[in-house]
Structure formats: structure tokens, C-alpha cells
């Protein structure tokens, strides 16, 4: 019986490694091909000129102004989208959990609704709105922050909702209220520190999604990283592929940080609190 279990365990281990190897080749081979393409000069020899230019910001800005404009615009869009999403979503989800539990399903439906709406449909609906946005706020690409908050909403909501589900929000709030804390104190000093990893997860997901968005920015005639890469591909395929590879690596890095922070938060929540032995009375 023990030998049968051992053989089954070995077969499962081999199967897992085969699956992991196949998936690794499937995902990493195109990345290696992109890297090889960006390091191949016109004479066929290996060169790092493309990557040296990519990290030399003044020279890159002078050589490829559309790309530099898109990078700056995307950084601003990432920052403002994350801030706007957290300011709108975190208090709303916490308040619904604490005071309006009957509206939880409705809020969940509204937050997940963008998953069913294609980006092109969003553009059709947002185009008249952005005509007024341009009239009042100008044609800055940072105004895409309002549009990007919609597609990132489902992912941010799921991350924050999972964090709230892992703690006893009601007990924490009732304990804080019994000690005289206001609702604002309960929200920002009691609940929020306990879902810090969930908030970071939501922020990382938003960064990855905003950096990869193309359709909305292109159809609304705004600039971002993906629009800059698309324009760059018409004049310099090597630099376009290099920037795409750098963006993919950045997104993978953010997802890796997401898994690390998420795993650390789960382990911290599962670790039992240390028990302090009571002193014996004399």
C-alpha cells in the first residue's frame, strides 16, 4: 500500500513538472524571441543600443517624442486612477459592509457590470461625455482617469471584498464604537489597516490594467503608453518591441509583488496571536 501511494505521488509530481515546463515554454519563448529581436542589429550582430536608448530618458525623449509623451501620460493616469479608485471604492465597500448590508448584492452587481461591457461600447457611451470634459478641463490625457476607473472597478472590488471577507468587520467596528470611536475613525484606523494587503492588491491590479489599455485612449484621441507603442511601431519596430517587453516585465513584476503581499497577508491573518502567560499570584 505504501509503495502504491509513493508511485502515485511520483507520477503526480512528474505530471506537475511537465505541466509547469510546458506552460513556462509557452509563456517565456515569445519573451525570449522579443529580447533577441531587440538585441539584433542591422548587420545581424548582437547589440544593446536599443536598451541603452530606452534607459537614456533625455535622448529617448528627443528621438521618440510620441513615446515619451505616452509614458508620462500613462504614469499620470496610473497615479490618478489608483487614487480615484481607492477614494471611491474603499469607503463605499466598508460602509456597505458595516451599515448597509442589504445593498451588498446591488453594489457587487454594479461593480462587476463593466466586465460585460466591451471597451468599444464604453467609448461610444463616453464620447459625448468627453466632449464636455474637454470643454471644461481641456484635452489632457489625464482626463482618461475618469474612464479608466470603470474597467478597473471589478478587479479592485474583488480584491478589496476578499480582504474584508477575511476579517470580522462587524466585531471590530462594534468594539471600536463601544470605546467611543467615530465612524470615520472606525473606517480609517480600525478596518483599513486590516485590509492593507487587499488595498495593495487592488492598486497593483489597477496599475497593470491601466498600463496595458489601448482601445479607450486610441478611440478618444488621447495618449498613453500603448498608443505611443503603436505609433512607434510604424517607424521603429525594434524600439516598439523593446518597450512592449519592458511593459510586460513590469506587469509580471507587479503581479509577483501582488502574490507576495497577498501570501504574506494570508499567513499573517492565519497565525495565532501569541498567548502571554499570566503571572502567578504570590
Residue ranges and their predicted role:
Residues 138-177, 185-186, 190-191:
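Membrane-cytosol interface at the C-terminal ends of specific transmembrane alpha-helices
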Residues 71, 96, 113, 160, ...:
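Short hydrophobic faces within alpha-helices
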Residues 2-8, 78-111, 124, 128-132, ...:
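Transmembrane-helix boundary motif in ABC transporter permease subunits
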Residues 16-17, 66-73, 129-156, 196-198:
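Loop-to-helix entry region at the N-terminal start of transmembrane alpha-helices
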Residues 6, 48, 120-150, 184, ...:
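Membrane-interfacial helix termini and adjacent extracytoplasmic/periplasmic loops
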Residues 8-12, 45-62, 211-269, 278-282:
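Interhelical loop and adjacent transmembrane-helix boundary motif
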Residues 17-27, 150, 157-160, 183-212, ...:
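Transmembrane alpha-helices
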Residues 1-33:
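N-terminal signal-anchor/first transmembrane alpha helix
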Amino acid at each position: 500500500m505504501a509503495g502504491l501511494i509513493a508511485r502515485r505521488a511520483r507520477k503526480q509530481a512528474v505530471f506537475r513538472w511537465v505541466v509547469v515546463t510546458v506552460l513556462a515554454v509557452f509563456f517565456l519563448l515569445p519573451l525570449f524571441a522579443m529580447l533577441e529581436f531587440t538585441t539584433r542589429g542591422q548587420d545581424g550582430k548582437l547589440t544593446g543600443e536599443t536598451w541603452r536608448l530606452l534607459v537614456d530618458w533625455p535622448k529617448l525623449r528627443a528621438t521618440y517624442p510620441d513615446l515619451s509623451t505616452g509614458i508620462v501620460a500613462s504614469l499620470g493616469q496610473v497615479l490618478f486612477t489608483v487614487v480615484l479608485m481607492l477614494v471611491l471604492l474603499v469607503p463605499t465597500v466598508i460602509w456597505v459592509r458595516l451599515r448597509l448590508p442589504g445593498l451588498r448584492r446591488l453594489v457587487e452587481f454594479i461593480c462587476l457590470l463593466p466586465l460585460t461591457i466591451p471597451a468599444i461600447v464604453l467609448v461610444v457611451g463616453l464620447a459625448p461625455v468627453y466632449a464636455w470634459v474637454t470643454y471644461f478641463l481641456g484635452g489632457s490625457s489625464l482626463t482618461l482617469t475618469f474612464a479608466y476607473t470603470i474597467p478597473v472597478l471589478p478587479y479592485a472590488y474583488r480584491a478589496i471584498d476578499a480582504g474584508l471577507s477575511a476579517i470580522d468587520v462587524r466585531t471590530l467596528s462594534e468594539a471600536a464604537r463601544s470605546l467611543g470611536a467615530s465612524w470615520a475613525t472606525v473606517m480609517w484606523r480600525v478596518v483599513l489597516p486590516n485590509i492593507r494587503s487587499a488595498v495593495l492588491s487592488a492598486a497593483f491590479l489597477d496599475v497593470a490594467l491601466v498600463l496595458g489599455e489601448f482601445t479607450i485612449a486610441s478611440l478618444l484621441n488621447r495618449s498613453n503608453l500603448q498608443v505611443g507603442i503603436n505609433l512607434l511601431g510604424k517607424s521603429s519596430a525594434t524600439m516598439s518591441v523593446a518597450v512592449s517587453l519592458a511593459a510586460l516585465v513590469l506587469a509580471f513584476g507587479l503581479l509577483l509583488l501582488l502574490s507576495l503581499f497577498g501570501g504574506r497577508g494570508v499567513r499573517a491573518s492565519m497565525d495565532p496571536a501569541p498567548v502571554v502567560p499570566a503571572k502567578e499570584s504570590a
